[in-house]
């Protein structure tokens, strides 16, 4: 069975089920796999010919082992990955791995849906309550991932009036086992309420509380799968010269890509692309870890100055004896992001700020004879207002958003007060 250890205390070892259920270890430490499996070149070639779901089952059972039988795992992955991850041609030597074809039009659908399948499988008949705070994207992905699953209730807190109306419609119109709560306060106030709930042992035990945090190991494992799916779509000559540029905020996507490489997937090198929140690029340049105050940018999902997955990146490099100076990096400011979006539009590809940053870093660093992929982490319509303004054109709403636009909001309004939240949750 799979063993994982806490990066802050290597003595704390847990099973896959424990890591999924707990999320974090003590001292808020991240869990990391004890064994790093590797496939042979022959196995990789065979896997690249499989379909997305069967291949993903093989990848994930290499990590999870017999803790979940491969047949069950494959069925659960089939429930999670119900949409494609196509590589869209942008230029002769560049493609975009589009991760926004799921129900909430963002890459988080992969991790969120697989995590939901794992949590409900592990919990069995025991009731589970997912409690999480969101500033938009994560909430939508979590809500849709758990919607309609048995024995699980989801409570999502968000700052009232501080997320886009479009995003609010995406997850506050579901009902059923999804409770959405608009809090009078900012995102930090929502986070504080979540923390209070997890400190309340009685509430935790009564409801089987779980955070479904983006740091959950099941999300990270799910994200490895789409790197294989990307390579499977490339011609042989591109596979041997592949450079992947990853838009980076919390660095989960980059961690997953590096794990794919560590499994044996042929990736020549990675580029970590950030916005003005450039803690990692500065660190890779001069070796000093010195986060600054977070700056608001166009690519707001990457407005992170202390990326919480970075310890996993460092651990993987240490374990594989890779050198950090082999990692490419770039920080792209808002002005350049806008120019790049217009440049992409001119060659026929409509993009949004996060993908544009990854493309910019890739284009600037791609060498002759190499093939480049950049990750498209969200549908341009998720950033409709800014994309329309920058590109001076109207974006049609994709079906997923249009279908929900006229539905009534089902949210409760609450003050930023734990007693009120507790009453609602116990009710």
Model-predicted regions and their roles:
Residues 1-427:
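PLP-dependent amino-acid enzyme catalytic core
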């Amino acid at each position: 069975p799979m063993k994982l250890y806490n990066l802050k205390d290597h003595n704390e070892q847990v099973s896959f089920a424990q890591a999924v259920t707990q999320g974090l270890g003590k001292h808020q430490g991240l869990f990391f796999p004890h064994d790093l499996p590797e496939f042979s070149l022959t196995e990789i070639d065979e896997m690249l010919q499989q379909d997305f779901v069967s291949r993903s089952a093989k990848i994930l059972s290499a990590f999870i082992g017999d803790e979940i039988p491969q047949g069950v795992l494959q069925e659960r992955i089939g429930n999670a990955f119900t949409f494609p991850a196509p590589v869209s041609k942008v230029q002769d030597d560049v493609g975009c791995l589009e991760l926004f074809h799921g129900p909430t039009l963002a890459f988080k659908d992969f991790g969120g849906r697989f995590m939901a399948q794992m949590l409900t499988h592990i919990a069995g008949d025991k009731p589970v309550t997912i409690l999480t705070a969101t500033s938009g994207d994560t909430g939508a992905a979590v809500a849709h991932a758990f919607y309609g699953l048995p024995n699980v209730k989801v409570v999502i807190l968000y700052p009232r009036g501080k997320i886009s109306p479009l995003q609010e419609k995406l997850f506050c119109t579901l009902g059923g086992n999804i409770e959405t709560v608009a809090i009078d306060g900012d995102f930090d106030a929502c986070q504080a309420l979540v923390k209070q709930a997890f400190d309340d042992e009685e509430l935790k035990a009564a409801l089987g509380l779980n955070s479904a945090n983006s740091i959950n190991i099941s999300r990270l494992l799910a994200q490895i799968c789409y790197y294989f799916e990307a390579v499977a779509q490339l011609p042989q000559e591109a596979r041997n010269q592949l450079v992947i540029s990853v838009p980076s905020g919390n660095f989960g996507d980059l961690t997953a890509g590096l794990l794919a490489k560590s499994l044996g997937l042929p990736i020549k090198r990675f580029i970590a692309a950030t916005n003005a929140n450039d803690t990692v690029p500065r660190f890779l340049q001069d070796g000093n870890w010195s986060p600054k105050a977070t700056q608001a940018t166009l690519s707001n999902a990457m407005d992170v100055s202390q990326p919480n997955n970075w310890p996993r990146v460092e651990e993987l490099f240490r374990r594989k004896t890779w050198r950090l100076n082999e990692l490419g990096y770039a920080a792209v400011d808002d002005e350049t992001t806008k120019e790049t979006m217009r440049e992409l539009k001119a060659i026929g590809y409509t993009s949004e700020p996060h993908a544009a940053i990854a493309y910019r870093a890739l284009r600037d660093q791609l060498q002759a004879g190499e093939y480049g992929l950049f990750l498209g982490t969200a549908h341009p319509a998720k950033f409709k207002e800014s994309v329309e303004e920058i590109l001076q054109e109207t974006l049609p709403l994709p079906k997923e958003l249009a279908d929900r636009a006229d539905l009534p909001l089902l949210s409760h309004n609450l003050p930023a007060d734990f007693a009120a939240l507790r009453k609602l949750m116990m009710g």
